[in-house]
Curated annotation (Swiss-Prot):
This is 4-hydroxy-tetrahydrodipicolinate reductase. Catalyzes the conversion of 4-hydroxy-tetrahydrodipicolinate (HTPA) to tetrahydrodipicolinate. The gene is dapB. Keywords: Amino-acid biosynthesis, Cytoplasm, Diaminopimelate biosynthesis, Lysine biosynthesis, NAD, NADP, Oxidoreductase. Its main location: cytoplasm. It comes from Exiguobacterium sp. (strain ATCC BAA-1283 / AT1b). Belongs to the DapB family. The keyword Transferase does not apply. SUPFAM superfamilies: Glyceraldehyde-3-phosphate dehydrogenase-like, C-terminal domain, NAD(P)-binding Rossmann-fold domains.
Length: 249
């Protein structure tokens, strides 16, 4: 598998490190404004089977154009897309395979599967999503928190509430509280709290290093490389991992 890494910040560097450890061939690194690596996708002239993108939303048009023109699958793990940009990704997926997720860890894929099963059973419980990240993270709430919120909304009629300071009223049963914590060097922590009468249930995922996201991105690349055009997500990553586990058993 020949991988192109698009975006060579902290995550891009870890993807390269993990790829080499797994024996995956990194044929190109594209880092806009870099003197050390290729500056633009248009300059790439080596074999590429799949692109792993940890860049920023401003580079999305060039990324989608590159994938479409060269018929190359894309793993898009960049965060902070607008609804319009997500729509552009979906449109492009009609022509090429695209895996898009704000979180590429298997643990979050598993957490989403647990929510799909648990949320329908929690009528009468108030649900809150709490996420914590390092002090340098700009967007809030995190893309992963939004992903979890969408999973909950799909199973219960709730509405995300992002602040309560200005609300002088009791919590409604249809509310889905969203909370963000920023500080220190926290890699990423997501908790879904189900608060009932006299009891609470918590589902929690904690990333202990960024390698978990690199491993997931490479697994996603391997998952979609031979797939038909379409939009793939964490559910596909979970299904693939489960299939491999069953084969080993």
């Amino acid at each position: 598998m020949n991988v192109l890494i698009h975006g060579f910040g902290a995550m891009g560097r870890i993807v390269e490190e993990v790829a080499h450890a797994q024996g995956v061939n990194v044929t190109a690194i594209v880092s806009p404004g870099s003197d050390e690596h290729t500056a633009t996708l248009n300059e790439v002239d080596v074999p590429v089977d799949v692109v792993i993108d940890f860049s920023n939303p401003a580079l999305l048009p060039d990324l989608l154009a590159f994938g479409r023109e060269r018929n190359i699958p894309l793993v898009i793990a960049t965060t902070g897309f607008t609804p319009e940009e997500l729509a552009e990704i979906e449109t492009a997926s009609q022509e090429i395979p695209i895996f898009q997720s704000y979180n590429t860890s298997y643990g979050i894929a598993l957490l989403k599967q647990l929510l799909d099963q648990l949320v329908p059973l929690t009528l009468g419980y108030d649900i809150e999503v709490i996420e914590a990240h390092h002090r340098k993270k700009v967007d809030a709430p995190s893309g992963t928190a939004e992903l979890l919120a969408r999973a909950i909304e799909a199973k219960r009629d709730v509405t995300p509430i992002y602040e309560r300071t200005s609300r002088r009223e009791a919590r409604g049963a249809e509310e889905l509280g969203m909370h963000s914590i920023r500080g220190g060097t926290i890699f990423g922590e997501h908790t879904v709290l189900f608060a009932g009468d006299d009891e609470m249930i918590e589902l929690k995922h904690t990333a202990l290093s960024k390698r978990v996201f690199a491993n997931g991105a490479l697994a996603a690349a391997a998952t979609i490389i031979d797939r038909p055009a379409g939009l793939y997500n964490l559910s596909n990553l979970y299904e693939e991992a489960t299939h491999v586990t069953h084969k080993r058993l």
